[in-house]
C-alpha cells in the first residue's frame, strides 16, 4: 500500500497576519503536511480535513472590537491540540471564557519572555537561565492587545513585565497560546517550539520529505493522466523546469514541451534550456523562435505595463500556434505553486489584501478544451527547489535568481530594441559571471543589469565616445516584500564596470543602484 504523505496533517487558520505563510513553511520544514485556510472555514470542511492539530495564526484585528474574526467552533469540538499565535491566542482566550484588553504598552520587535509554567510545549526549551533559575526565551513580539484573564483550566506559560500572560497552556486538552511569533527567525527557539507542538503534542510523523513528495506526485500524475498526452510551456524558470523534470519521470514521451524564445532571454539561455531538457534528459521540446514577432509587437511602446501586456499576449499567440500543430493533447501542465493557490482563494473570497495577476497561458485551457495538470500546487517555492534537486536538476538551475516573465523587456527602460537587448544580455552575463567568481552570487537574492536609453560621454584611448549607460542592481531579501541593496565590495564593482565598458562596444558608463525596497521596487519597471 502506497504511503499517504498527507495522512498526518496540520490545519492553519489565517486571520490576516503577514507571517501566516511563514508558519506553513516552518511546519513543512519539520516534515509535516499542512494547509492554510481562511479563519471562517466552515465547520464541516474542518471536520472533513481531519487535522491532527490546528494552529490559529496572527492577525491585525482587535478581539474586543465588534465583528472581529473568530475561530470556528469546530476547532474546539474536534478534541485535537490547538496552538494560538498572537491574535490566535487572544481569540482562543476570549472564545473560551477569558478576557482580552487593549494596552498602552505595545510590544513590537525583540523581547525576552520568562518561561513560567511547566508545560509540554516549552519543557526543556530555553535561551537563558538567570541566577534565580528562571528560564528565558528570546522572541519576536508584534501586538498591542493582550490577554488579561485566562479561561478556566489554563495556566500561565510565559510572561514579560508589560504582558504578564505572554503565553498560556492547558496540557490536558493540548491547548496552547503564545503572544510571540515562533515562526520568525528572530524567535531563536521557534523551530523547536513548533516541532514540539506538531510532532510531540499532535503526534505527526515526518512524512513530508522531498523523496516522498516526488513519489507521491508521480503517482498522482499517472493516476490523473493515464495514457493521455500532456503539453507544457517551458520557460527555463525554476517552476516550469521542475514540472518538466517531474512529468518526464512520470509519463516520459507523453509529455511535449513548447519553449518560446522571445528574444528577451539571458545570454545563451535558449540553448542552455534545450541542452538540459532535450539533449541531456531526452524530453520532447519544441523551440519556437519568435524574437522577430515579439520585437515587432513591442516597436514604439515605452510604457512598462503596456510592454508587459504585449509580451504576455504575444507569448499566448506563439504558444497557441505551436500547440495547435500537435495532435491528441488532452492535458495542459502548469507550474502553479501553493502561494498562487492561496492568492486565488483569497481573491475569490475577497479576503486577500494583495492580489498578484499571473499570466501563464491565458485562456488556452478553455480554448483547446484541455484539462489542467498542476503537480506543484501544494508546494512552496523552497519546496519546489528541493524537489528539483531530488529530480536531478543542477543546483545552479534550481537556485538561480528570479527572472521576470517579460524577461529583458522590463529591464530595458522605455522602448525595446534588438540592439538594446543584445547589449544588455552581454552586460548582464559579465555581472553574473563576476558575482559567481567572487562567491557573491548566492549571497545576493537577485542581481541583474538595467539598460538606460540615455547616452553619456566617455573616453577611449585618445578618442571621445558617446554611448549608453547601464545600472547594476543587486539586492538581499528573505521574502522579496522588502529588500536591501547588496553591499558588494568596491573591488568587485570596479572589475564588473571595467569589463563591461571595455568588452562591450556601446556602453560608456556603469552605475550601481543603492535603493532599497521600499521605497524603490527591485525591478526598475
From Swiss-Prot:
Its EC number is 6.3.5.2. PANTHER family: GMP SYNTHASE [GLUTAMINE-HYDROLYZING] (PTHR11922:SF2), GMP SYNTHASE-RELATED (PTHR11922). The active site is at residues 86, 181, 183. Keywords: ATP-binding, Glutamine amidotransferase, GMP biosynthesis, Ligase, Nucleotide-binding, Purine biosynthesis. Homodimer. ATP binds at residues 235-241. InterPro entries: Class_I_gatase-like, GATASE, GMP_synth_C, GMP_synth_GATase, GMP_synthase, GMPS_ATP_PPase_dom, NAD/GMP_synthase, Rossmann-like_a/b/a_fold. This is GMP synthase [glutamine-hydrolyzing]. It comes from Pseudomonas putida (strain ATCC 47054 / DSM 6125 / CFBP 8728 / NCIMB 11950 / KT2440).
Amino acid at each position: 500500500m502506497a504511503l499517504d504523505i498527507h495522512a498526518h496533517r496540520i490545519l492553519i487558520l489565517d486571520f490576516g497576519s503577514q507571517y501566516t505563510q511563514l508558519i506553513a513553511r516552518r511546519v513543512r520544514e519539520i516534515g509535516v503536511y499542512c494547509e492554510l485556510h481562511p479563519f471562517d472555514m466552515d465547520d464541516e470542511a474542518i471536520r472533513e480535513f481531519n487535522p491532527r492539530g490546528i494552529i490559529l495564526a496572527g492577525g491585525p484585528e482587535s478581539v474586543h472590537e465588534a465583528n472581529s474574526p473568530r475561530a470556528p467552533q469546530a476547532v474546539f469540538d474536534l478534541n485535537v491540540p490547538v496552538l494560538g499565535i498572537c491574535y490566535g491566542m487572544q481569540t482562543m482566550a476570549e472564545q473560551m471564557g477569558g478576557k482580552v484588553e487593549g494596552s498602552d504598552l505595545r510590544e513590537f520587535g525583540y523581547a525576552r519572555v520568562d518561561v513560567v509554567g511547566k508545560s509540554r510545549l516549552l519543557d526543556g526549551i530555553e535561551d537563558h537561565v538567570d541566577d534565580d533559575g528562571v528560564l528565558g526565551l528570546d522572541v519576536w513580539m508584534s501586538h498591542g492587545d493582550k490577554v488579561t484573564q485566562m479561561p478556566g483550566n489554563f495556566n500561565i506559560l510565559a510572561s514579560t513585565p508589560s504582558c504578564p500572560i505572554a503565553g498560556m497552556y492547558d496540557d490536558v486538552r493540548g491547548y496552547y497560546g503564545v503572544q510571540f511569533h515562533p515562526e520568525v527567525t528572530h524567535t531563536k527557539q521557534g523551530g523547536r517550539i513548533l516541532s514540539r507542538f506538531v510532532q510531540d503534542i499532535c503526534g505527526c510523523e515526518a512524512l513530508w520529505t522531498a523523496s516522498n513528495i516526488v513519489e507521491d506526485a508521480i503517482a498522482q500524475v499517472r493516476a490523473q493522466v493515464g495514457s493521455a498526452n500532456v503539453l507544457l510551456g517551458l520557460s527555463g524558470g525554476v517552476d516550469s523546469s521542475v514540472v518538466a523534470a517531474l512529468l518526464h519521470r512520470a509519463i516520459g514521451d507523453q509529455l511535449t514541451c513548447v519553449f518560446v524564445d522571445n528574444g528577451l532571454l539571458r545570454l545563451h539561455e535558449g540553448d542552455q534550456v534545450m541542452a538540459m531538457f532535450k539533449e541531456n534528459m531526452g524530453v520532447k521540446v519544441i523551440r519556437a523562435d519568435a524574437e522577430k514577432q515579439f520585437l515587432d509587437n513591442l516597436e514604439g511602446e515605452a510604457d512598462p505595463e503596456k510592454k508587459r501586456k504585449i509580451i504576455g499576449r504575444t507569448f499566448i499567440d506563439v504558444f497557441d500556434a505551436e500547440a495547435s500543430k500537435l495532435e491528441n493533447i488532452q492535458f495542459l501542465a502548469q507550474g502553479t505553486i501553493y502561494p498562487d493557490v492561496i492568492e486565488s482563494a483569497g481573491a475569490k473570497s475577497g479576503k486577500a489584501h494583495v492580489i498578484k495577476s499571473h499570466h501563464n497561458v491565458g485562456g488556452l485551457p478553455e480554448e483547446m478544451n484541455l484539462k489542467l495538470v498542476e503537480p506543484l500546487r501544494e508546494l512552496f517555492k523552497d519546496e519546489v527547489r528541493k524537489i528539483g534537486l531530488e529530480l536531478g536538476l543542477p543546483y545552479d538551475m534550481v537556485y538561480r535568481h528570479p527572472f521576470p516573465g517579460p524577461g529583458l523587456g522590463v529591464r530595458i527602460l522605455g522602448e525595446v530594441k534588438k540592439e538594446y537587448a543584445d547589449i544588455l544580455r552581454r552586460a548582464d552575463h559579465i555581472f553574473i559571471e563576476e558575482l559567481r567568481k567572487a562567491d557573491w552570487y548566492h549571497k545576493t537574492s537577485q542581481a541583474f543589469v538595467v539598460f538606460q536609453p540615455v547616452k553619456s560621454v566617455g573616453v577611449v584611448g585618445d578618442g571621445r565616445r558617446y554611448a549608453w549607460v547601464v545600472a547594476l542592481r543587486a539586492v538581499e531579501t528573505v521574502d522579496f516584500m522588502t529588500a536591501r541593496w547588496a553591499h558588494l565590495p568596491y573591488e568587485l564593482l570596479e572589475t564588473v564596470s571595467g569589463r563591461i565598458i571595455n568588452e562591450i562596444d556601446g556602453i560608456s558608463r556603469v552605475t550601481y543602484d543603492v535603493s532599497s525596497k521600499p521605497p524603490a521596487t527591485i525591478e526598475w519597471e
